Amino acid sequence: MLIYKCLYFRSFLKVIHNLRIKSSFNREPITEKSILGTELLFLTKKQDRMKNLCILILVSFFISCQEKSTNPDIALIQKAQLIHMKTLTLDTHDDINVKNFTDSLNYSMDTDTQVNLPKMERGGLDVAWFIVYTGQGELNAEGYEKAAANAQAKFEAIHRLVDQYEPNKIGLAHSRASLDSLRKIGKRAAMIGVENAYPLGENLSEVKRYYDLGARYMSLAHNGHNQFSDSNTGEFDGSTKHNGISELGKRVIDSMNYYGIMVDLSHPSKESIRQTIAHSKAPVIASHSSARALSDHPRNLDDEQLEWIKEKGGVVQTVALALFVNKEKHEKYKAAWEALEDKTDTLALEALKKKTPPVDISDFVDHIDYIKNKIGIDHVGISSDFDGGGGVEGWKDASETFNVTLELVKRGYTKEEIAKIWSGNLLRVLDEVEAVAAQLQAN
């Protein structure tokens, strides 16, 4: 540690010098806000985290000497920063558009997307699960062919990111071991989830091909019933197709268990979820769902479903999508925002937020609290649904990821609990799914 302190002491002095100049000019003391504003703590490479840590220690020492501050917020923020830097942060649901994966426009740049590498670096997000999503179409050869082409284009886009656009900064991970390997060489990780098994058609050999392309979770359905499963959208009109999952759906689950792909429960109907859990030989996940007790929406999970997932050894990745976090609060804010005449008027927008607050990060973490209290700390995780409708005040994009850790620290979560919530629980399930696959393949 002393060696690192010596190596980076000049950097520290430069930061403090700049802060002193700013402080002197503004006639304000150096505070946590001035430090946070330097982007000091989230440098752009994972291998720089030791530098971050050393500078943080020196800055903390400087503040204590300068102010003898009694402000508890400073200590809380510093504690959260240390935890955030040491924790593997993983978001299980980030949608993509292939238009953002070209030579001239891609995630190596700070695009207007909610997730890209610069935003991940600024927010300290280590792992993004990029989603191969296809909307539900007709259940015929033409529909399957079109969906398969859509899915293939998204697989290829993700591979271009890690192979061509930013191979020195991000790699494709398939397991905990490959994640660890990427971390050791200072890279962030992309992982792949498939949202809607519809593009498989009726060709179950595609499950193996998707696995080989990097898919490590897949949902049987999305918005609309398909050849494998009923969707939770049937709750709106009372419709079903299979009264759960079809025989073909059971065979897809068997294939996913065999190869080591986690079964995702976030879009199928309640009866489909019950039957899927009963049929699967491996634990399951809900990649982006929250607690229905707090926000009554079919995409969320009721207490009975939460218990089913716990009993199966699975994990619920709480989602930061405003409608699913607090339906009533979101609808009130949305109505007020739509009534605003000039939506570019910053002052009017701030006044609106004070009068009619939007769904925020505190509301989101309420769901983590609820699920933790209902089924235990080992069965809850985090997802954003960024670039697919997700985002709440305080976590509007990947650059604000630290705020989630800060809110957890404010609520008294320990560093061990935060590590489980951010990635430990999800990776435990992935490990167990891989173990089941190895056993099935050995028999």
Residue ranges and their predicted role:
Residues 66-240, 292, 296-443:
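N-terminal hydrophobic targeting/anchoring segments and the immediately downstream early-domain regions
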